[in-house]
Regions:
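Aromatic-rich, lipid-facing transmembrane alpha helices and their immediate juxtamembrane interface loops
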Residues: 2-297
Length: 297
């Protein structure tokens, strides 16, 4: 009796192959079982949640140039809710629910505190007041505003850790905080133009960016590093996947620059914000990309 070959015989093109009885000794039939794809795990499904939230939030922002009035306000509220939820759920998947709650309470709480003091006293941003366009308020501050702090504070914390982590808390707070503050060069002109808040004394201002006093940017450069320092101390230091937060930062930087330049007619805002935010986001994206390449080697 001859032994069975190590591989099945290949049939001629277009014809099924059926082995004859006794052709392989005692083999009576040949059964081929196709490999089944691995089932999608619940962890993979959960990992898609912050991706979906962030992507939907970005889509809401992309629609801004096409909207006005109440539709624009709804899109603004929706984008902040979705992007802040993306930050919190990403932190929950990376570090656990307790850390995510710490992120939300700390960032939103400090943001609310700074804004409430600012509205009441004019310190540290200057004298300003919110309109009634962003929903319910606490202490004169719309609830949405602390969530806006949260949605960018988280990715800026990760940016600060990657770019300034070798210099301890001071390095993380300085780099991450200034990155967060640079965002306001886009944020304030947009919100003032949309009528969400107004400044009592809007001068002196940046060239080409009327309506927002320089004191506002100074206030951000005080509050944002303080917030990042507290978050750095309060949250775990374990490395996390950074693609979703990095994508949010990249979109905020490039999308805001493009929107102000092309759609909103604010070229100076595009210039100031694009340069300032690019000083932090561009090196961060480059460093993150290099790190991912090194990990694959």
């Amino acid at each position: 009796m001859t032994s069975a070959p190590s591989a099945a015989r290949i049939a001629p093109a277009g014809r099924p192959y059926t082995p004859l009885v006794g052709e392989y000794g005692d083999v009576r039939e040949l059964t081929v079982v196709a490999a089944r794809p691995e089932p999608v795990t619940w962890q993979a499904r959960l990992a898609a949640v912050p991706v979906g939230l962030a992507a939907t939030g970005v889509l809401a922002q992309i629609a801004h140039p096409l909207l006005d009035g109440s539709s624009l306000r709804r899109a603004t509220v929706t984008a902040v809710l979705l992007l802040s939820a993306a930050a919190v759920t990403h932190a929950a998947l990376a570090w656990g629910v307790r850390a995510a709650a710490t992120l939300l309470v700390t960032a939103a709480g400090l943001g609310l505190l700074a804004e409430a003091v600012g509205v009441a006293t004019g310190v540290p941003f200057g004298e300003y007041s919110y309109a009634g366009t962003l929903g319910p308020k606490i202490g004169g501050v719309p609830v949405l505003v602390p969530l806006a702090w949260t949605m960018l504070a988280y990715p800026c914390l990760l940016l600060g850790r990657r770019l300034g982590g070798n210099h301890g808390t001071a390095g993380v707070a300085t780099v991450g905080g200034l990155a967060l503050a640079s965002w306001d060069l886009f944020l304030d002109p947009q919100m003032v133009a949309d009528g969400h808040w107004t400044w009592l004394f809007p001068h002196p201002a940046l060239p080409g960016v009327p309506g927002i006093p320089l004191t506002n940017y100074g206030g951000w450069m005080l509050v944002a590093p303080w917030m990042i320092a507290v978050l750095h101390q309060a949250l775990p230091r374990d490395p996390v996947p950074e693609r979703v937060p990095a994508a949010v930062l990249a979109w905020t930087w490039l999308g805001s620059a493009l929107g102000n330049l092309v759609f909103f007619g604010r070229p100076w805002v595009a210039l100031w914000g694009g340069l300032a935010m690019g000083l932090f986001v561009a090196p961060y994206l480059w460093r993150l990309r290099r790190h991912e390449r090194e990990e694959r080697l």
